[in-house]
């Protein structure tokens, strides 16, 4: 498996914690926010080395970097859910954390977000940007049933489109490392042409997933207006 290297991006915020060889800076979510840890792996068929990880939560935010195996871990005061962006070289991937625990950032989480955004009647860009303030989106991304159903839908589409059965449909929160589990799934998807050179799912696959998400949401557009909207359902994270 080939690996790619990216420059370490440092972000200065209040407070700092040194984790192994990676620099981490976290901004607390206020005195009432609990201290929690979010960890996982960033990969696209190869681990993202020294990738810059940015987390923006309902309350609190943090930055860290991935190690040589694409793994990251950050402990800070926050209230979920959190949007997560991983950037390294030409590759940028997105994911989310319902709360503390293991969450991965992969081409599969890009598809998961496409499905959930369409189900909510919005776009991935809008979903992530408004997640810290929009109650509808927060509810949707902190409900285990909705997330599990969305993961299952994505897994089914991949099976039907490419004949690939994922090692686990719970790909958001299932821990993995280089050469096993979800990492092998990503290798197969890249070989099948489901993932492009930037780590993003190809347009045809994204369109199929988005169409399915829209159908699951019944064409809802209620979450796209006003940060204080209510309603929707979503999922919870798991700890490794």
Give the predicted meaning of each segment.
Residues 15-16, 58:
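Generic detector of short alpha-helix boundary/capping microenvironments
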Residues 28-240:
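Feature for extracytoplasmic/surface-facing segments of secreted or surface-associated proteins
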Residues 2-15:
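Bacterial N-terminal signal peptides that target proteins for export
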Residues 22-26:
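C-terminal motif of bacterial Sec signal peptides marking the signal peptidase cleavage site
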Residues 16-20, 51:
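N-terminal export signals
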């Amino acid at each position: 498996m080939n690996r790619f290297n990216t420059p370490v991006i440092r972000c200065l915020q209040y407070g700092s914690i040194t984790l192994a060889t990676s620099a981490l800076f976290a901004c607390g979510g206020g005195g009432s926010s609990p201290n929690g840890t979010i960890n996982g792996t960033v990969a696209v068929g190869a681990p993202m080395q020294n990738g810059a990880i940015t987390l923006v939560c309902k309350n609190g935010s943090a930055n860290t970097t991935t190690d040589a195996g694409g793994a990251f871990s950050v402990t800070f005061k926050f209230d979920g859910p959190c949007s997560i962006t991983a950037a390294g070289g030409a590759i940028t991937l997105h994911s989310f954390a319902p709360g503390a625990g293991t969450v991965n950032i992969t081409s599969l989480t890009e598809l998961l977000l496409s499905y959930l955004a369409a189900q909510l009647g919005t776009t991935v860009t809008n979903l992530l940007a408004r997640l810290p303030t929009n109650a509808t989106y927060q509810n949707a991304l902190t409900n285990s049933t909705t997330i599990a159903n969305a993961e299952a839908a994505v897994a089914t589409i991949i099976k039907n489109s490419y004949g690939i059965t994922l090692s686990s449909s719970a790909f958001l929160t299932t821990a993995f490392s280089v050469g096993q589990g979800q990492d092998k799934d990503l290798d197969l998807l890249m070989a099948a042409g489901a993932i492009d050179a930037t780590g993003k799912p190809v347009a045809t696959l994204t369109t199929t997933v988005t169409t399915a998400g829209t159908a699951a949401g019944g064409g809802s557009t209620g979450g796209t207006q006003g940060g204080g909207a209510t309603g929707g359902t979503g999922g919870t994270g798991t700890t490794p």
